[in-house]
Structure formats: C-alpha cells, structure tokens
C-alpha cells in the first residue's frame, strides 16, 4: 500500500483505529488474501475514501429510516387505539397473544419510564393516577425494536392486518421488514460497516406486491436489498422522496465504489421500484 502522507496516516489510525480501518483494507487485498498483499495501485487515500463512503451511506440510510420509524410508530398507535377503543391498550395484557413477550415489553416500558427525563412523561406522572401513560406517549420513548416486538405480539389479527396494509404489505412480510429495518438502523447507529456487509436477517417476501418492486435477482442479505425495503416504505410515506437522488449523488462523489459489493445488480436503476 502506498502512503503519501505518513503523518496524516498515523493521525487517522490513532483516531479511527487499525482494526476498524482494516475492514476497508480487506477488499483491496490481492487473492489469496491470506498473504496480506494489496492490489497494485492501492493507496491509504483509497482506504480512507472507502471509509468515508461507508460513513455517508450510513448517514443516508439512518436519515431515511427515521422517517419510516415515525410513520410506523404513528400507525401502530392510531390503529391500535382506534380499534381497541383504549388509549392504554399497549399495557393491557388482554390485547396480546404471548404473556411472556408481553411481560418483557412491560419490563422495558417500566425501565424507560424510570429513566426518561422527558417533560411530557413527568407531567403525566404528576397529573394522572394511571400506572402507565397512553400509547401515543409510550411510543415516543420506546426504542423502535420494542415497538416492533409489541406489534408482533398483538392478539387482534385485524389490527395487525390494518397496520400492515397501510404500508402495502401482508402481516408476515411487514413484521419481517421491520426487523430488517431495525437491524440496519442499529448498524448505522453503532457506526458499523454496512457497504459490503452480509446481514443475518433474510426478509420474508410477500405473496404478491401491490406496489412497484424489484425484478432482477438480488442477494437479500446485502445492503441493496435493505435499501429497496426502505424505498418501498418511503414511497408510501413520502411519495416525492429524494432517496434515489441522494444515492446517485453519493455514487457520483465516490465513483470508484463497486456497487456490486453492496448487492446492486446490473441495471438496477431500471427496476420499477426506482422509476
């Protein structure tokens, strides 16, 4: 590997760490990679550009996932409250199938309530005698993973179906896609590498798609597939979203990045989902 500015390289290594950067060096090694010899023309600058690309990709994904989180929380609260007629339905065991899962959710809810410093929660505690706040308050303080677990445990199938349908999906794929989004979100939050990662969750596919989707063979464990799921949600939540524009600008800034490493198939831009 060519290092043109040794002082700058030492600076980056001391603030980022060799182990973290090594994940971006690995794809640039010659085969067999066990020899730890870099391909011809590899520079430390190229490693850093790949690192920056991944960072900007995480920021892009997190920004789009945030919109999905807000919309999903809202749908679960609105449909759950409307169809049960109970503002406190999230903490009522009668509304859930699995008592053990419900108890775990209650434990997590209580933990959040005990540690939160949100003014609206403190105001509720001081003003009302109810043991728990209504569902629309709880969803503001609960982690997204807890919200998805609450959804998966809802007993009333009509409620689950109504929520899933509002996002153009059947119940099983909706639950699965929420899990995929949660895993991707957590990777972004924890600054994990995402650009060429092989994710562990294989998404459940709908029997039929009511909206434009992808047709080309695609690796469901690569980040491109996660991006397709994100785009599906965004097209419902915000039909005029600019996710594709952001992606194209990112790739234009880093033209050397191999899209195939992210799982992008040749001709992806012509897929119905991306039109």
Task: Give, region by region, the residue ranges found by the protein language model.
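Acidic/aromatic/glycine-rich contiguous surface patches that form carbohydrate-binding/processing clefts
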Residues: 191
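Extended intrinsically disordered or low-complexity regions, especially N/C-terminal cytosolic tails and loops
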Residues: 1-183, 195-275
């Amino acid at each position: 590997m060519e290092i043109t500015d040794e002082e700058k390289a030492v600076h980056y290594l001391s603030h980022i760490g060799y182990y973290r950067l090594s994940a971006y060096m690995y794809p640039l090694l010659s085969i067999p990679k066990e020899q730890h010899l870099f391909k011809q023309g590899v520079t430390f600058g190229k490693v850093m550009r790949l690192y920056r690309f991944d960072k900007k990709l995480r920021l892009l994904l997190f920004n789009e996932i945030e919109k999905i989180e807000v919309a999903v929380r809202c749908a679960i609260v609105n449909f759950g409250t409307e169809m049960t007629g109970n503002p406190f339905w999230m903490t009522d065991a009668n509304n859930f199938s699995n008592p053990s899962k419900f108890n775990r959710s209650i434990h997590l809810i209580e933990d959040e309530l005990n540690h939160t410093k949100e003014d609206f929660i403190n105001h509720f505690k001081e003003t009302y005698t109810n043991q728990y706040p209504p569902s629309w308050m709880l969803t503001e303080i609960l982690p997204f993973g807890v919200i998805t677990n609450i959804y998966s445990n809802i007993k009333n199938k009509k409620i689950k179906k109504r929520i899933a349908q509002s996002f153009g999906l059947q119940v099983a794929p909706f639950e699965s896609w929420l899990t995929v989004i949660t895993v991707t979100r957590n990777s972004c939050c924890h600054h994990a590498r995402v650009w060429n990662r092989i994710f562990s969750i294989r998404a459940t596919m709908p029997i039929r798609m009511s909206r434009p989707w992808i047709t080309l063979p695609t690796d469901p464990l690569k980040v491109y597939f996660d991006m397709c799921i994100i785009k599906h949600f965004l097209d419902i939540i915000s039909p005029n979203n600019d996710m594709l524009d952001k992606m194209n600008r990112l790739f234009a800034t880093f033209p050397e990045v191999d899209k195939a490493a992210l799982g992008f198939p040749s001709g992806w831009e012509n897929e119905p989902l991306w039109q």
